[in-house]
A protein has these predicted regions:
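Short sequence motifs at beta-strands and strand-loop junctions characteristic
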Residues: 83-85, 145, 173-176
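Extracytoplasmic beta-strand/coil segments of soluble accessory domains associated
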Residues: 67, 71-109, 131
Length: 186
């Protein structure tokens, strides 16, 4: 019995040393960024559209939801339950309600599968991560089904930064509305 215990201890000890001697043979390969982009309108596309850049969004982004940031685009109408543009907001384009507006982020549909609308209250301060937005009025170039005959809103988020960065923003407004944003990356 003692010989079996001794043999077991000897084998366990030998396996520990065998694992310690192995070297890592994995290579690290940095790949280029892959960006998923949905169909966007260009000057050659027969679609009425408006591009909103990051700079334009920054000028207006005080914590309100994206529909209020798009309120200055042609044919857009926004409403808010509380009146401040935060929380339950809606977007209408050319009179069409949110159930007929296709909204995508990096080409991925954001609309609810059942009601076909987007609940902006579930996306607080998403505008701080957006690179640009294209609003297409009318049927547009969307390939995401019947929900797009009113309009299409295509949001592209910021790409991967190869340089370390840090950013802190704070805003305060009426009705005790406030927004704090912290962004960093390595």
């Amino acid at each position: 019995m003692k010989k079996m215990i001794f043999a077991g201890c000897l084998m366990a000890g030998a396996s520990v040393f065998a694992q310690a001697g192995e070297t890592d043979s994995l290579k690290v390969v940095n790949l280029q960024e892959v960006q998923i982009v949905s169909t966007r309108a260009t000057s050659k596309t027969p679609v009425a559209f408006t591009n909103v850049s990051k700079e334009e969004l920054k000028k207006q982004n005080f914590g309100q939801d994206i529909p209020f940031l798009l309120s200055m685009t042609p044919s857009a109408l926004t409403t808010s339950d509380a009146g401040a543009g935060i929380g339950y907001t809606t977007l209408r384009v050319r009179g069409t309600d949110g159930t007929r507006i296709n909204i995508t982020a990096n080409g991925i549909p954001m609309n609810d599968a059942e009601s076909h609308t987007l609940f902006w209250v579930n996306m607080p301060d998403f505008a701080s991560s957006v690179k640009d937005i294209q609003v297409q009025r009318g049927a547009g170039t969307s390939t995401n089904g019947a929900g797009a005959f009113g309009a299409s809103v295509n949001m592209q988020t910021e790409g991967i930064s190869m340089q370390p960065y840090a950013e802190i923003n704070a805003s305060y407004g009426s009705f005790n509305a406030h927004k704090e944003t912290v962004k960093f990356g390595t």
